[in-house]
Protein backbone atom coordinates (compact mmCIF):
# COMPACT_ATOMS: atom_id res chain seq x y z
CA UNK A 1 0.00 0.00 0.00
CA UNK A 2 1.74 3.17 -1.24
CA UNK A 3 1.36 6.24 0.98
CA UNK A 4 2.95 9.67 0.62
CA UNK A 5 6.32 10.58 2.11
CA UNK A 6 4.73 13.44 4.07
CA UNK A 7 2.46 11.04 5.94
CA UNK A 8 5.52 9.36 7.45
CA UNK A 9 6.74 12.56 9.13
CA UNK A 10 6.44 12.64 12.91
CA UNK A 11 3.12 14.41 13.54
CA UNK A 12 3.95 14.72 17.24
CA UNK A 13 6.76 17.14 16.42
CA UNK A 14 4.37 19.31 14.40
CA UNK A 15 1.96 19.42 17.34
CA UNK A 16 4.62 21.09 19.50
CA UNK A 17 4.50 24.08 17.16
CA UNK A 18 0.75 24.02 16.49
CA UNK A 19 0.10 24.38 20.23
CA UNK A 20 2.05 27.67 20.41
CA UNK A 21 -0.11 30.78 21.04
CA UNK A 22 -0.68 33.01 18.01
CA UNK A 23 -1.67 36.23 19.80
CA UNK A 24 -4.39 38.29 18.14
CA UNK A 25 -3.36 37.22 14.66
CA UNK A 26 -5.54 34.95 12.52
CA UNK A 27 -4.50 32.61 9.71
CA UNK A 28 -6.95 32.65 6.79
CA UNK A 29 -6.57 29.92 4.18
CA UNK A 30 -7.95 31.12 0.83
CA UNK A 31 -9.33 28.28 -1.33
CA UNK A 32 -10.24 28.40 -5.02
CA UNK A 33 -11.08 26.18 -7.99
CA UNK A 34 -8.28 26.00 -10.56
CA UNK A 35 -8.45 25.97 -14.35
CA UNK A 36 -9.33 22.27 -14.56
CA UNK A 37 -12.73 22.90 -12.96
CA UNK A 38 -11.97 20.02 -10.59
CA UNK A 39 -8.75 20.82 -8.74
CA UNK A 40 -8.58 23.00 -5.65
CA UNK A 41 -5.75 25.34 -4.67
CA UNK A 42 -5.07 27.19 -1.43
CA UNK A 43 -2.73 29.65 0.24
CA UNK A 44 -2.71 31.38 3.60
CA UNK A 45 -2.41 34.98 4.78
CA UNK A 46 -2.26 36.57 8.22
CA UNK A 47 -5.08 38.85 9.39
CA UNK A 48 -4.74 41.29 12.31
CA UNK A 49 -8.02 40.20 13.93
CA UNK A 50 -10.72 37.56 13.61
CA UNK A 51 -13.16 38.44 10.79
CA UNK A 52 -16.83 38.31 11.79
CA UNK A 53 -18.11 37.88 8.24
CA UNK A 54 -16.95 37.38 4.67
CA UNK A 55 -17.32 41.12 3.98
CA UNK A 56 -14.41 41.79 6.39
CA UNK A 57 -12.01 39.62 4.39
CA UNK A 58 -9.64 41.34 1.96
CA UNK A 59 -9.39 40.43 -1.71
CA UNK A 60 -6.15 38.75 -2.74
CA UNK A 61 -4.43 37.58 -5.92
CA UNK A 62 -2.41 34.67 -7.29
CA UNK A 63 -0.41 33.56 -10.31
CA UNK A 64 -2.97 32.17 -12.74
CA UNK A 65 -0.31 30.89 -15.15
CA UNK A 66 0.53 28.20 -12.58
CA UNK A 67 -3.08 27.04 -12.13
CA UNK A 68 -4.10 26.65 -15.81
CA UNK A 69 -6.00 29.95 -15.61
CA UNK A 70 -3.96 32.58 -17.48
CA UNK A 71 -0.95 33.35 -19.63
CA UNK A 72 2.38 34.16 -18.00
CA UNK A 73 2.52 37.64 -19.55
CA UNK A 74 -0.68 38.71 -17.75
CA UNK A 75 -1.05 36.20 -14.99
CA UNK A 76 -2.46 38.01 -11.95
CA UNK A 77 -5.90 36.70 -10.97
CA UNK A 78 -8.13 38.08 -8.21
CA UNK A 79 -9.46 36.06 -5.27
CA UNK A 80 -12.76 37.47 -3.98
CA UNK A 81 -13.95 35.86 -0.72
CA UNK A 82 -17.39 34.27 -1.05
CA UNK A 83 -17.86 32.03 2.01
CA UNK A 84 -16.06 31.59 5.33
CA UNK A 85 -15.76 28.54 7.60
CA UNK A 86 -13.91 27.62 10.79
CA UNK A 87 -10.54 25.97 10.14
CA UNK A 88 -10.55 22.39 11.51
CA UNK A 89 -6.80 21.97 10.91
CA UNK A 90 -5.49 25.09 12.67
CA UNK A 91 -8.64 25.48 14.81
CA UNK A 92 -10.23 28.71 16.07
CA UNK A 93 -9.86 31.58 15.47
CA UNK A 94 -8.40 30.59 12.09
CA UNK A 95 -10.55 30.44 8.95
CA UNK A 96 -11.11 28.66 5.66
CA UNK A 97 -12.12 31.16 2.96
CA UNK A 98 -13.75 29.92 -0.25
CA UNK A 99 -13.18 32.38 -3.08
CA UNK A 100 -14.43 33.27 -6.53
CA UNK A 101 -11.73 33.83 -9.15
CA UNK A 102 -11.72 36.85 -11.47
CA UNK A 103 -9.42 37.72 -14.37
CA UNK A 104 -7.32 40.86 -14.72
CA UNK A 105 -10.34 42.66 -16.27
CA UNK A 106 -12.58 41.67 -13.31
CA UNK A 107 -14.56 39.21 -15.41
CA UNK A 108 -15.14 35.77 -13.86
CA UNK A 109 -12.58 33.10 -14.74
CA UNK A 110 -13.78 30.32 -17.04
CA UNK A 111 -14.11 27.86 -14.15
CA UNK A 112 -15.78 30.40 -11.84
CA UNK A 113 -19.26 28.96 -12.28
CA UNK A 114 -20.39 30.38 -8.94
CA UNK A 115 -20.73 33.88 -10.37
CA UNK A 116 -23.58 33.06 -12.78
CA UNK A 117 -25.08 30.49 -10.41
CA UNK A 118 -25.49 33.20 -7.75
CA UNK A 119 -27.39 35.43 -10.19
CA UNK A 120 -29.70 32.56 -11.16
CA UNK A 121 -30.32 31.61 -7.50
CA UNK A 122 -31.17 35.21 -6.62
CA UNK A 123 -33.85 35.22 -9.36
CA UNK A 124 -35.76 32.38 -7.66
CA UNK A 125 -34.99 33.05 -3.99
CA UNK A 126 -38.71 33.46 -3.22
CA UNK A 127 -39.22 29.78 -4.11
CA UNK A 128 -36.63 28.67 -1.53
CA UNK A 129 -34.84 25.97 -3.57
CA UNK A 130 -33.21 23.33 -1.37
CA UNK A 131 -30.50 20.94 -2.47
CA UNK A 132 -28.81 17.91 -0.97
CA UNK A 133 -25.85 16.32 -2.78
CA UNK A 134 -24.49 12.81 -2.18
CA UNK A 135 -20.76 12.93 -2.84
CA UNK A 136 -19.20 9.57 -3.67
CA UNK A 137 -15.42 9.16 -3.79
CA UNK A 138 -12.78 6.43 -3.89
CA UNK A 139 -9.71 6.16 -1.67
CA UNK A 140 -6.47 5.42 -3.54
CA UNK A 141 -2.84 4.85 -2.66
CA UNK A 142 -0.30 7.26 -4.12
CA UNK A 143 0.38 4.62 -6.78
CA UNK A 144 -3.22 4.90 -8.02
CA UNK A 145 -4.23 1.50 -6.61
CA UNK A 146 -7.50 1.43 -4.62
CA UNK A 147 -6.91 1.58 -0.87
CA UNK A 148 -6.94 -1.86 0.77
CA UNK A 149 -7.19 -3.83 -2.49
CA UNK A 150 -4.74 -6.73 -2.96
CA UNK A 151 -1.61 -5.52 -4.73
CA UNK A 152 -1.77 -8.25 -7.36
CA UNK A 153 -5.51 -8.75 -7.80
CA UNK A 154 -9.01 -7.76 -6.79
CA UNK A 155 -11.12 -8.03 -3.64
CA UNK A 156 -14.20 -10.24 -3.55
CA UNK A 157 -17.13 -9.15 -5.73
CA UNK A 158 -19.48 -6.35 -4.71
CA UNK A 159 -22.15 -7.20 -2.20
CA UNK A 160 -20.81 -7.06 1.38
CA UNK A 161 -19.23 -3.60 1.22
CA UNK A 162 -22.21 -1.19 1.05
CA UNK A 163 -22.67 0.15 4.61
CA UNK A 164 -20.34 -2.70 5.61
CA UNK A 165 -18.71 -3.26 8.98
CA UNK A 166 -15.48 -5.16 9.63
CA UNK A 167 -11.86 -5.15 8.52
CA UNK A 168 -12.65 -7.22 5.42
CA UNK A 169 -15.52 -4.94 4.33
CA UNK A 170 -14.74 -1.32 5.29
CA UNK A 171 -11.50 0.11 3.91
CA UNK A 172 -10.33 3.44 5.36
CA UNK A 173 -12.99 4.34 7.92
CA UNK A 174 -10.47 6.43 9.93
CA UNK A 175 -10.37 8.91 7.04
CA UNK A 176 -14.17 9.03 6.81
CA UNK A 177 -14.57 9.70 10.54
CA UNK A 178 -11.85 12.36 10.57
CA UNK A 179 -13.44 14.11 7.59
CA UNK A 180 -16.92 13.98 9.14
CA UNK A 181 -15.79 15.57 12.41
CA UNK A 182 -13.69 18.18 10.59
CA UNK A 183 -16.73 19.20 8.50
CA UNK A 184 -18.91 19.51 11.61
CA UNK A 185 -16.26 21.69 13.26
CA UNK A 186 -15.96 23.88 10.17
CA UNK A 187 -19.70 24.53 10.02
CA UNK A 188 -20.28 22.51 6.85
CA UNK A 189 -23.85 21.22 6.55
CA UNK A 190 -22.77 17.58 6.39
CA UNK A 191 -25.78 15.27 6.77
CA UNK A 192 -24.11 11.85 7.00
CA UNK A 193 -21.70 9.27 5.59
CA UNK A 194 -21.74 5.64 4.49
CA UNK A 195 -19.54 3.01 2.88
CA UNK A 196 -20.46 2.48 -0.77
CA UNK A 197 -20.93 -0.56 -3.04
CA UNK A 198 -17.33 -0.83 -4.26
CA UNK A 199 -14.65 -1.50 -1.61
CA UNK A 200 -12.66 1.67 -0.77
CA UNK A 201 -15.57 3.77 -2.07
CA UNK A 202 -17.38 6.04 0.38
CA UNK A 203 -20.04 8.73 0.36
CA UNK A 204 -20.85 11.82 2.36
CA UNK A 205 -23.97 13.92 2.02
CA UNK A 206 -24.17 17.72 2.18
CA UNK A 207 -27.46 19.51 2.78
CA UNK A 208 -30.15 20.51 2.81
CA UNK A 209 -28.67 23.80 1.63
CA UNK A 210 -30.62 26.69 0.15
CA UNK A 211 -29.51 28.31 -3.09
CA UNK A 212 -25.83 29.16 -3.53
CA UNK A 213 -24.87 27.57 -0.18
CA UNK A 214 -25.01 24.13 -1.81
CA UNK A 215 -21.96 24.75 -3.96
CA UNK A 216 -20.03 26.58 -1.24
CA UNK A 217 -20.51 23.81 1.32
CA UNK A 218 -19.77 20.93 -1.07
CA UNK A 219 -16.60 22.48 -2.48
CA UNK A 220 -15.22 23.21 1.00
CA UNK A 221 -16.18 19.70 2.16
CA UNK A 222 -14.17 18.36 -0.80
CA UNK A 223 -11.23 20.57 0.19
CA UNK A 224 -11.37 19.26 3.77
CA UNK A 225 -11.44 15.68 2.45
CA UNK A 226 -8.31 16.28 0.35
CA UNK A 227 -6.52 17.81 3.35
CA UNK A 228 -7.51 14.94 5.65
CA UNK A 229 -6.31 12.43 3.04
CA UNK A 230 -3.05 14.38 2.72
CA UNK A 231 -2.44 13.86 6.45
CA UNK A 232 -3.13 10.12 6.09
CA UNK A 233 -0.95 9.88 2.97
CA UNK A 234 -3.67 8.64 0.59
CA UNK A 235 -5.68 10.17 -2.25
CA UNK A 236 -9.41 10.77 -2.61
CA UNK A 237 -10.49 10.65 -6.25
CA UNK A 238 -13.81 11.90 -7.60
CA UNK A 239 -13.29 10.09 -10.91
CA UNK A 240 -16.76 8.82 -11.93
CA UNK A 241 -15.39 5.42 -13.00
CA UNK A 242 -12.03 4.89 -11.29
CA UNK A 243 -11.94 1.12 -11.87
CA UNK A 244 -13.17 -0.23 -15.22
CA UNK A 245 -15.20 -3.41 -15.33
CA UNK A 246 -17.82 -4.86 -13.01
CA UNK A 247 -17.45 -2.21 -10.31
CA UNK A 248 -19.76 0.66 -9.42
CA UNK A 249 -18.86 4.14 -10.59
CA UNK A 250 -19.03 7.28 -8.45
CA UNK A 251 -21.78 9.85 -8.73
CA UNK A 252 -23.06 12.93 -6.96
CA UNK A 253 -26.81 12.30 -6.77
CA UNK A 254 -28.58 15.62 -6.33
CA UNK A 255 -31.80 16.01 -4.36
CA UNK A 256 -33.91 19.07 -5.16
CA UNK A 257 -37.09 20.68 -3.89
CA UNK A 258 -38.86 24.02 -3.70
CA UNK A 259 -41.20 25.35 -1.03
CA UNK A 260 -44.17 24.35 -3.21
CA UNK A 261 -42.85 20.78 -3.60
CA UNK A 262 -42.40 20.43 0.15
CA UNK A 263 -45.96 21.52 0.94
CA UNK A 264 -49.25 19.55 0.63
CA UNK A 265 -49.77 18.02 -2.83
CA UNK A 266 -46.29 19.15 -3.83
CA UNK A 267 -45.97 15.98 -5.93
CA UNK A 268 -47.75 17.89 -8.70
CA UNK A 269 -44.84 20.35 -8.92
CA UNK A 270 -42.31 17.52 -8.73
CA UNK A 271 -43.96 15.79 -11.69
CA UNK A 272 -44.08 19.07 -13.64
CA UNK A 273 -40.33 19.53 -13.08
CA UNK A 274 -39.57 15.98 -14.20
CA UNK A 275 -41.57 16.59 -17.38
CA UNK A 276 -39.46 19.70 -18.10
CA UNK A 277 -36.24 17.77 -17.39
CA UNK A 278 -37.29 15.00 -19.79
CA UNK A 279 -37.22 17.51 -22.67
CA UNK A 280 -33.75 18.87 -21.86
CA UNK A 281 -31.70 15.74 -21.17
CA UNK A 282 -28.63 16.56 -23.27
CA UNK A 283 -28.29 20.05 -21.78
CA UNK A 284 -28.16 18.53 -18.31
CA UNK A 285 -25.72 15.79 -19.30
CA UNK A 286 -23.34 18.51 -20.53
CA UNK A 287 -23.71 20.43 -17.24
CA UNK A 288 -23.23 17.38 -15.02
CA UNK A 289 -19.51 16.74 -15.42
CA UNK A 290 -16.54 19.05 -16.12
CA UNK A 291 -15.89 17.52 -19.55
CA UNK A 292 -19.35 18.12 -20.98
CA UNK A 293 -20.55 14.55 -20.55
CA UNK A 294 -17.41 12.64 -21.53
CA UNK A 295 -16.60 11.64 -17.95
CA UNK A 296 -20.15 10.50 -17.29
CA UNK A 297 -20.18 8.39 -20.46
CA UNK A 298 -17.89 5.95 -18.64
CA UNK A 299 -20.31 5.76 -15.70
CA UNK A 300 -23.87 6.10 -17.08
CA UNK A 301 -24.05 2.76 -18.88
CA UNK A 302 -27.41 1.49 -17.67
CA UNK A 303 -25.60 -0.94 -15.35
CA UNK A 304 -24.37 -0.67 -11.74
CA UNK A 305 -27.37 1.37 -10.54
CA UNK A 306 -27.16 3.96 -13.32
CA UNK A 307 -29.33 5.07 -16.21
CA UNK A 308 -28.10 5.11 -19.81
CA UNK A 309 -26.49 8.43 -20.73
CA UNK A 310 -28.51 8.64 -23.96
CA UNK A 311 -31.95 8.05 -22.45
CA UNK A 312 -34.08 9.94 -19.94
CA UNK A 313 -36.12 7.96 -17.45
CA UNK A 314 -37.92 8.53 -14.16
CA UNK A 315 -39.54 6.30 -11.58
CA UNK A 316 -40.48 5.79 -7.94
CA UNK A 317 -37.67 4.11 -5.95
CA UNK A 318 -35.90 3.21 -9.24
CA UNK A 319 -32.12 3.48 -8.93
CA UNK A 320 -31.72 2.66 -12.62
CA UNK A 321 -33.55 5.85 -13.63
CA UNK A 322 -32.28 9.34 -14.45
CA UNK A 323 -34.68 10.79 -11.88
CA UNK A 324 -35.82 8.88 -8.80
CA UNK A 325 -38.83 9.83 -6.71
CA UNK A 326 -38.25 8.36 -3.23
CA UNK A 327 -40.99 5.95 -2.17
CA UNK A 328 -41.91 8.06 0.87
CA UNK A 329 -42.40 11.09 -1.41
CA UNK A 330 -44.75 9.08 -3.62
CA UNK A 331 -46.73 8.03 -0.56
CA UNK A 332 -46.89 11.45 1.11
CA UNK A 333 -47.40 13.26 -2.22
CA UNK A 334 -44.86 15.94 -1.30
CA UNK A 335 -41.11 16.31 -0.79
CA UNK A 336 -38.27 16.20 -3.30
CA UNK A 337 -36.81 14.29 -6.23
CA UNK A 338 -33.33 12.90 -6.87
CA UNK A 339 -31.38 13.55 -10.07
CA UNK A 340 -29.00 10.58 -10.33
CA UNK A 341 -27.09 11.82 -13.39
CA UNK A 342 -24.40 14.19 -11.96
CA UNK A 343 -20.93 12.65 -11.82
CA UNK A 344 -18.78 12.57 -8.68
CA UNK A 345 -16.49 15.24 -10.17
CA UNK A 346 -19.31 17.60 -11.18
CA UNK A 347 -19.29 21.27 -10.26
CA UNK A 348 -22.25 21.72 -7.88
CA UNK A 349 -22.70 25.29 -9.12
CA UNK A 350 -23.24 23.96 -12.66
CA UNK A 351 -25.63 21.21 -11.49
CA UNK A 352 -27.80 23.38 -9.25
CA UNK A 353 -27.92 26.21 -11.80
CA UNK A 354 -29.07 23.81 -14.53
CA UNK A 355 -31.88 22.48 -12.31
CA UNK A 356 -33.10 26.01 -11.55
CA UNK A 357 -32.97 27.08 -15.19
CA UNK A 358 -35.01 24.12 -16.40
CA UNK A 359 -37.41 23.52 -13.50
CA UNK A 360 -38.09 27.06 -12.26
CA UNK A 361 -37.14 29.45 -15.07
CA UNK A 362 -38.76 27.16 -17.67
CA UNK A 363 -35.84 27.30 -20.08
CA UNK A 364 -35.84 24.94 -23.06
CA UNK A 365 -33.30 24.03 -25.72
CA UNK A 366 -29.67 23.01 -25.58
CA UNK A 367 -28.18 26.33 -24.44
CA UNK A 368 -28.69 28.39 -21.27
CA UNK A 369 -30.61 31.64 -21.68
CA UNK A 370 -28.59 34.85 -21.30
CA UNK A 371 -30.39 37.14 -18.83
CA UNK A 372 -29.72 40.87 -18.73
CA UNK A 373 -28.34 42.37 -15.52
UniProtKB/Swiss-Prot annotation:
N6-acetyllysine: modified positions: 11, 14
Record: residues binding L-glutamate: 246-247, 319, 340
Enzyme Commission code(s) on record: 6.3.1.2, 2.3.1.225
Catalyses which reaction(s): L-glutamate + NH4(+) + ATP = L-glutamine + ADP + phosphate + H(+); L-cysteinyl-[protein] + hexadecanoyl-CoA = S-hexadecanoyl-L-cysteinyl-[protein] + CoA
Domain of life: Eukaryota
Record SUPFAM superfamilies: Glutamine synthetase, N-terminal domain (SSF54368), Glutamine synthetase/guanido kinase (SSF55931)
Residues annotated as binding Mn(2+) 2: 136, 196, 203
Record keywords, A-Z: Acetylation, Angiogenesis, ATP-binding, Cell membrane, Cytoplasm, Endoplasmic reticulum, Ligase, Lipoprotein, Magnesium, Manganese, Membrane, Metal-binding, Microsome, Mitochondrion, Nucleotide-binding, Palmitate, Phosphoprotein, Transferase, Ubl conjugation
Residues bearing the modification N-acetylalanine: 2
Activity regulation behaviour: Glutamine synthetase activity is inhibited by methionine sulfoximine (MSO).
Location relative to the cell: Cytoplasm, Cytosol; Microsome; Mitochondrion; Cell membrane
GO molecular function: ATP binding; glutamine synthetase activity; metal ion binding; protein-cysteine S-palmitoyltransferase activity
Residue positions binding Mn(2+) 1: 134, 253, 338
SMART domains per record: Gln-synt_C
Region (Required for glutamine-induced ubiquitination by CRL4(CRBN) and proteasomal degradation): 2-25
Amino acids binding ADP: 336-338
Modified residues (Phosphotyrosine): 104
Family: Belongs to the glutamine synthetase family.
Binding partners and assembly: Decamer; composed of two pentamers. Interacts with PALMD. Interacts with RHOJ. Interacts with BEST2; this interaction tethers a fraction of GLUL to the membrane, causing a decrease of cytosolic glutamine synthase (GS) activity and inhibits the chloride channel activity of BEST2 by affecting the gating at the aperture in the absence of intracellular glutamate.
Name of the protein this chain belongs to: Glutamine synthetase
Gene designation: GLUL
Amino acid sequence: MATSASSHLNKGIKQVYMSLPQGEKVQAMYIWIDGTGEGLRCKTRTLDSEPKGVEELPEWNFDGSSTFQSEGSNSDMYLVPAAMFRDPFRKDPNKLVFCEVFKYNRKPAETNLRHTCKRIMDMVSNQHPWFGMEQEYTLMGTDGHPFGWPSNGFPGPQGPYYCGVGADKAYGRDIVEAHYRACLYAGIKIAGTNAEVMPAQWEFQIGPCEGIDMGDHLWVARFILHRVCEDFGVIATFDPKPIPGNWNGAGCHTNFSTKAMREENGLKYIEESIEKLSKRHQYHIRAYDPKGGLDNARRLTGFHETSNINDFSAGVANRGASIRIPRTVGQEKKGYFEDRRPSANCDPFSVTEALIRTCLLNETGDEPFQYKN
